Swiss-Prot record:
<dbReference type="GO" id="GO:0043770">
    <property type="term" value="F:demethylmenaquinone methyltransferase activity"/>
</dbReference>
<dbReference type="GO" id="GO:0032259">
    <property type="term" value="P:methylation"/>
</dbReference>
<protein>
    <recommendedName>
        <fullName>Ubiquinone/menaquinone biosynthesis C-methyltransferase UbiE</fullName>
        <ecNumber>2.1.1.163</ecNumber>
        <ecNumber>2.1.1.201</ecNumber>
    </recommendedName>
</protein>
<dbReference type="GO" id="GO:0009060">
    <property type="term" value="P:aerobic respiration"/>
</dbReference>
<keyword id="KW-0489">Methyltransferase</keyword>
<keyword id="KW-0474">Menaquinone biosynthesis</keyword>
<dbReference type="GO" id="GO:0009234">
    <property type="term" value="P:menaquinone biosynthetic process"/>
</dbReference>
<keyword id="KW-0808">Transferase</keyword>
<feature type="binding site">
    <location>
        <position position="81"/>
    </location>
    <ligand>
        <name>S-adenosyl-L-methionine</name>
    </ligand>
</feature>
<dbReference type="GO" id="GO:0008425">
    <property type="term" value="F:2-methoxy-6-polyprenyl-1,4-benzoquinol methyltransferase activity"/>
</dbReference>
<feature type="binding site">
    <location>
        <begin position="130"/>
        <end position="131"/>
    </location>
    <ligand>
        <name>S-adenosyl-L-methionine</name>
    </ligand>
</feature>
<comment type="similarity">
    <text>Belongs to the class I-like SAM-binding methyltransferase superfamily. MenG/UbiE family.</text>
</comment>
<comment type="function">
    <text>Methyltransferase required for the conversion of demethylmenaquinol (DMKH2) to menaquinol (MKH2) and the conversion of 2-polyprenyl-6-methoxy-1,4-benzoquinol (DDMQH2) to 2-polyprenyl-3-methyl-6-methoxy-1,4-benzoquinol (DMQH2).</text>
</comment>
<comment type="pathway">
    <text>Cofactor biosynthesis; ubiquinone biosynthesis.</text>
</comment>
<dbReference type="InterPro" id="IPR029063">
    <property type="entry name" value="SAM-dependent_MTases_sf"/>
</dbReference>
<keyword id="KW-0831">Ubiquinone biosynthesis</keyword>
<dbReference type="InterPro" id="IPR004033">
    <property type="entry name" value="UbiE/COQ5_MeTrFase"/>
</dbReference>
Length: 258
């Protein structure tokens, strides 16, 4: 299942929330969303997940279980504020090295400042680049992580192929993303929370509900667990699996470069 489609006008289109936009239009629109929320991104995730994103991220790092080796290299994509990368570094006993890549400079600035305050900047690099065109050689990383970022990429299938390219043989892909709720009744509650409460909380916190409306809509347009797992396989990954969190509100996808 590809995220990119041919429009009635003959051009390539993709989703920006519930809107259909040209593939080249999506990234600037997404950038604008995250420029607006960069300084309050963690609060945004608390609102989006009712605080559960912290538990899900801890579970993601536990699944990765980074070893305490200085030659262990992780690429964390769409990780601007450093939330995942910091957890990886700490879990490894401050031995592993994480490269934080994001297309949004505002997010990276927040992450770099947080790293300095934590005293772990020596374990981190911050790189402004596009997930669809990674500025790294093939077979460079032991792991590739992305949390709540893949749905914002205009061409998801291209980003997954790039992930495969830069991973070493035996390297692991981990994708944490909001997903399709599979628990009866929870889906109704989550829809009500998403479309009624989240934009209102967003406006209260930041003065602007538009970024939160987009983020809610982008979750609904993202492929379900099985369709996304198929996309990961199509990119070349083996031993593909997923684990639902909180009834499917989020899911952790895993794949290996064999």
């Amino acid at each position: 299942m590809a995220d990119e489609r041919v429009s009635a006008r003959g051009g390539m289109e993709t989703s920006f929330g519930f809107r259909e936009v040209g593939t080249g239009e999506k990234q600037p629109l997404v950038n604008d969303v995250f420029h607006k929320v960069a300084k309050r991104y963690d609060i945004m995730n608390d609102v989006m997940s009712a605080g559960l994103h912290r538990v899900w991220k801890d579970a993601m790092i536990a699944a990765l279980n980074p070893p305490g080796r200085e030659d262990y290299r992780v690429l964390d994509v769409a990780g601007g504020t450093g939330d995942i990368a910091f957890r990886i570094v700490e879990r490894s006993g401050r031995k592993a090295h994480a490269t934080v890549l994001d297309i949004n400079g505002s997010m990276l600035s927040v992450g770099a400042e947080r790293a300095r305050k934590k005293g772990i900047e020596a374990n981190l690099d911050f790189v402004e680049a596009n997930a669809e065109d990674l500025p790294f050689a093939a077979n460079s990383f032991d792991a590739y992580t992305i949390a709540f970022g893949i749905r914002n990429v205009p061409r998801i299938e291209v980003a997954l192929k790039e992930a495969y390219r830069v991973l070493k043989r035996g390297g692991r892909l981990l994708v944490l993303e909001f997903s399709e709720v599979e628990m009866p009744l929870l889906d109704r509650f989550y829809d009500a929370w998403s479309f009624n409460a989240i934009p209102k909380f967003g406006k209260l916190i930041t003065g602007d509900d538009a970024p939160y409306q987009y983020l809610v809509e982008s979750i609904r347009k993202f492929p379900n667990q099985r369709d996304f797992a198929a996309m990961i396989r199509d990119a070349g990954f083996a031993r593909v699996s997923f684990t639902n969190y909180t009834g499917g509100i989020a899911a952790l996808h895993s794949g290996w470069k064999i």
